[in-house]
A protein has these predicted regions:
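Outer-membrane beta-barrel domain signature
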Residues: 72-79
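Short S/T/G/P-rich N-terminal loop/turn motif that feeds into the first structured element of a domain
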Residues: 1-49, 54-70, 83-106
């Protein structure tokens, strides 16, 4: 499993909130075209924003990098922030499945 991680640190925490909505709306458009397995967007208290996207193949990750560039370029023209990115492979991940396992009888 491959990952692309974007760490953005905004000057103003309110800018990070606005940007998180923008990213959620616009990066979701790449789920199908880039065969994305998951995406998470996290907002930290002091204007930090982290976006993590998972892919099954390196070529899907590269496609996402190319296609999503315009989304990040749009934000750069609107807000002041510092951005660091890296691509990597998952070594360990755990996610509990949200499913009700009880049966209620009436």
């Amino acid at each position: 499993m491959y990952a692309k991680v974007f760490n953005l640190k905004f000057v103003k925490p309110t800018d990070a909130k606005v940007a998180s909505s923008y990213f959620a709306e616009n990066l979701a458009k790449f789920i199908r075209p880039c065969n994305m397995q998951s995406i998470s967007i996290s907002l930290g208290p002091c204007g930090s924003l982290t976006i993590t996207a998972k892919f099954d193949s390196g070529s899907d990750l590269k496609t996402f990098e190319l296609q999503s560039k315009s989304v990040f370029d749009d934000i750069k023209t609107s807000f002041d922030f510092i951005q660091t990115n890296y691509s990597g492979v998952y070594i360990y991940t755990f996610e509990a499945e949200n499913a009700a396992t009880e049966i209620t009888l009436n």
